[in-house]
Amino acid sequence: MRLSAQLTNTKLADEEVPELASVPDGVSRWTGADLDRLRSAARRGGVGAEQQDLEQKLCRTIDILGARSQKTQGINAVLTSVARLRESNTFRLYLLTQNHRGVGILKMGVKKLFVTHPVTCGLVEVDPLCVLDFYVDESCQRQGYGKQLYAHMLDAEHVSRPELLAIDRPSDKLLGFMKKHYGLTAYTPQVNKFVVFHGFFGHTTVSERGKLLRTTSPTGAAAAATGTKAKNEMPG
């Protein structure tokens, strides 16, 4: 990232988060398409000043919290912004608000990954739902907001087991969060820096083309259909 962009994001991170008067406290979900609809409605006119105000302040909130996340993690590239949300229709952002101000973000999206299988030690292709960015404002940490945000996401995404998610470059703090709240610790280090817990591979088999297939049981019909050997399977 160019130095000018880094300075811009640092300045943005220091801005005060605007009040979102029309957004109820709790967790809301936003996609690039949602934000585009808000922007289009505001530009067309015919909407009240309140809606125009929401579009501007919501987008600013997302950009500020994304910049704060980048600053906290000490990384060069911003992971969450309105522009980044528009890059893929699989991206969705969970925004946590308290007292009508954004205090946390959780960005999710589907990615195609090649990861090392913990049993065969070979590369397999997976396309999991991924945690791409997770941030709670420093002033609101250790108050249960992170767990509230994560639990809401799991429910909204219909994820029955947290280990079915992949996490992009998690910090030690996030790994500690996963251990504390979900008992997840075992994973094989990956070249791409994603963390995929060993439980992700439960009830799976590997096709002849190297794609991980999920079965209903360790000896499910998918294994028979692909002709994959049972030794490539992981128990649940």
Curated annotation (Swiss-Prot):
* InterPro entries per UniProt: Acyl_CoA_acyltransferase, Atat, GNAT_ATAT
Domain of life where this protein originates: Eukaryota
> Which residues does the UniProt record annotate as the domain N-acetyltransferase?
21-201
Q: So what EC number does this one have?
A: 2.3.1.108
Q: Where is this site: Crucial for catalytic activity?
A: 73
Q: Which biological process annotations from GO are given for this protein? A: regulation of microtubule cytoskeleton organization
Which Pfam families has this protein been placed in?
Acetyltransf_16
Quickly give the catalysed reaction. Answer: L-lysyl-[alpha-tubulin] + acetyl-CoA = N(6)-acetyl-L-lysyl-[alpha-tubulin] + CoA + H(+)
**Enzyme class label:** transferase
Q: Which keywords does this chain's UniProt record carry?
A: Acyltransferase, Transferase
- The record's region (Disordered) falls at 217-236
Binding residue positions for acetyl-CoA: 134-147, 171-180
Its GO CC terms are:
microtubule
- Bias (Low complexity) occurs at 219-229
Supply the SUPFAM superfamilies for this chain. Answer: Acyl-CoA N-acyltransferases (Nat)
Q: Which GO terms describe its molecular function?
A: tubulin N-acetyltransferase activity
Name the protein family: Belongs to the acetyltransferase ATAT1 family.
So what does this one do?
Specifically acetylates 'Lys-40' in alpha-tubulin on the lumenal side of microtubules. Promotes microtubule destabilization and accelerates microtubule dynamics; this activity may be independent of acetylation activity. Acetylates alpha-tubulin with a slow enzymatic rate, due to a catalytic site that is not optimized for acetyl transfer. Enters the microtubule through each end and diffuses quickly throughout the lumen of microtubules.
| PANTHER family, sorted | ALPHA-TUBULIN N-ACETYLTRANSFERASE 1
Protein name stated in the entry: Alpha-tubulin N-acetyltransferase
Organism from which the protein derives: Leishmania braziliensis
Q: What is the lineage of its organism?
A: Eukaryota, Discoba, Euglenozoa, Kinetoplastea, Metakinetoplastina
